[in-house]
């Protein structure tokens, strides 16, 4: 918004020449981070008071951690604060003609809406299950598949008109069209090594990354500050990849595919980092507010979408290792319990409690120890991921 205003003012008079600073992506990214941070810090107390007044408090299940019983009633659905700060800062500082930012906003707000309905049913309607699994996965699939099909064509072409032409050409070919190498799955640490996915393969991978990341972040969001800081770290690292792939010079030098327009995602990533830090101010132990599904599902979906656009799905898998392990721990626990119950007549567990962070709590770790150690691991994983920029 401000970029368009600055460009318009420059056409009116040379006196507005100083507004050329708005053309610099790095400046707008820094301002987006600062804007989201300030908006989050200023609006945070009001949002928390409103949530408390509406009695939107976090229910704690009886079979959960005993040490978490004191958290019962803490305001939840604080993810609306994060999403508002991200959306406000992004819309203020990004180039409105950029299609990649719009699709990331679509996924973010789409998953946020799904999470909002889930939280509302749990907290307000007192339905412990919230949205049923099939219903939730259906709507997640709708958002994920729409994003997958759109990105298939928008990554391949640089203009919306060419995107539309490519879509019709794909349909006319019987869904058997050769796409540019840009949509291939890149393998980190190796020069110019990639695996062709094809159109359908790309859509399936995109769907799995977006929906998987959304649910993985949601599963991680179980302790004060546990999920939000890894989101900030991974999002910031993905912003670096977005800047590289969006630059014809840097992408050529570092042997990355050049995806025109993807650099603008740095503005969104910066806004997400600023909003995340603002939320952490209120979410750090002891938390004044919880993110809820409205925030966790949305942020996970956003990270997955950005990873797909910048063609760094495997690197995202590495940097978001905490999210991956948390999700695997839940799946392994459920599958092993069902298997042993069927075979031995009684369900057995791999972990003391799932997700993994609760296992460590049951093992004697304090909540703050689990959180900070998971942060440190995420920081190391992000550094490994960033090293793939040069170590190839």
Curated annotation (Swiss-Prot):
Gene Ontology molecular function: metal ion binding; phospho-N-acetylmuramoyl-pentapeptide-transferase activity; UDP-N-acetylmuramoyl-L-alanyl-D-glutamyl-meso-2,6-diaminopimelyl-D-alanyl-D-alanine:undecaprenyl-phosphate transferase activity
Keyword Cell cycle belongs to the record: yes
Catalysed conversion reaction: UDP-N-acetyl-alpha-D-muramoyl-L-alanyl-gamma-D-glutamyl-meso-2,6-diaminopimeloyl-D-alanyl-D-alanine + di-trans,octa-cis-undecaprenyl phosphate = di-trans,octa-cis-undecaprenyl diphospho-N-acetyl-alpha-D-muramoyl-L-alanyl-D-glutamyl-meso-2,6-diaminopimeloyl-D-alanyl-D-alanine + UMP
PROSITE patterns xref list: MRAY_1 (PS01347), MRAY_2 (PS01348)
Listed EC numbers: 2.7.8.13
Membrane-protein topology: Multi-pass membrane protein
Cofactor dependence: Mg(2+)
Highest taxon, organism lineage: Bacteria
Pfam families according to UniProt: Glycos_transf_4 (PF00953), MraY_sig1 (PF10555)
InterPro entries: Glycosyl_transferase_4, PNAcMuramoyl-5peptid_Trfase, PNAcMuramoyl-5peptid_Trfase_CS
Gene Ontology terms describing biological process: cell division; cell wall organization; peptidoglycan biosynthetic process; regulation of cell shape
NCBIfam families in the cross-refs: mraY (TIGR00445)
HAMAP family in alphabetical order: MraY
Database matches in PANTHER family: PHOSPHO-N-ACETYLMURAMOYL-PENTAPEPTIDE-TRANSFERASE, PHOSPHO-N-ACETYLMURAMOYL-PENTAPEPTIDE-TRANSFERASE HOMOLOG
Protein name: Phospho-N-acetylmuramoyl-pentapeptide-transferase
Annotated source species: Variovorax paradoxus (strain S110)
Gene that encodes the chain: mraY
């Amino acid at each position: 918004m401000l970029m368009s205003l600055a460009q318009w003012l420059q056409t009116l008079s040379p006196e507005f020449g100083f507004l050329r600073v708005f053309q610099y992506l790095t400046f707008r990214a820094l301002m987006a981070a600062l804007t989201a941070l300030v908006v989050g810090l200023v609006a945070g107390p009001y949002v928390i008071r409103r949530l408390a007044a509406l009695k939107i408090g976090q229910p704690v299940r009886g079979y959960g951690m005993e040490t978490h019983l004191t958290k019962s009633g803490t305001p939840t659905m604080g993810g609306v604060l994060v999403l508002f700060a991200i959306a406000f800062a992004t819309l203020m500082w990004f180039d409105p003609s950029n299609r990649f930012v719009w699709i990331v906003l679509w996924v973010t707000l789409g998953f946020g809406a799904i999470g909002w309905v889930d939280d509302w049913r749990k907290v307000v309607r007192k339905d412990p299950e919230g949205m049923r699994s099939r219903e939730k996965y259906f709507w997640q699939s709708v958002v994920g598949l729409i994003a997958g099909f759109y990105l298939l064509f928008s990554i391949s072409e640089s203009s919306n008109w060419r995107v539309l032409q490519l879509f019709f050409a794909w349909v006319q070919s019987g869904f058997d069209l050769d796409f540019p190498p840009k949509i291939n799955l890149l393998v980190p640490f190796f020069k110019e090594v990639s695996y062709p996915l094809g159109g359908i393969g790309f859509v399936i991978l995109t769907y799995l990354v977006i929906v998987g990341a959304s649910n993985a972040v949601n599963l991680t969001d179980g302790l004060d500050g546990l999920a939000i800081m890894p989101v900030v770290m991974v999002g910031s690292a993905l912003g670096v990849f977005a800047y590289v792939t969006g630059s014809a010079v840097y992408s050529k030098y570092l042997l990355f595919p050049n995806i025109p327009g993807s650099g603008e995602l740095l503005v969104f990533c910066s806004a997400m980092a600023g909003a995340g830090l603002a939320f952490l101010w209120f979410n750090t132990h002891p938390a004044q507010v919880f993110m809820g599904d409205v925030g966790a599902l949305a942020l996970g979906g956003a990270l997955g979408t950005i990873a797909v656009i910048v063609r760094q799905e495997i690197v995202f898998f590495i940097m978001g290792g905490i999210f991956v392990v948390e999700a695997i721990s839940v799946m392994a626990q459920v599958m092993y319990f069902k298997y042993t119950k069927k075979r031995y007549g009684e369900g057995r567990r791999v972990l003391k409690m799932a997700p993994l962070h609760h296992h460590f709590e049951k093992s004697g770790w304090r909540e703050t120890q689990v959180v900070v150690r998971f942060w440190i691991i995420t920081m190391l994983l992000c550094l490994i991921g960033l090293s793939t920029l040069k170590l190839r």
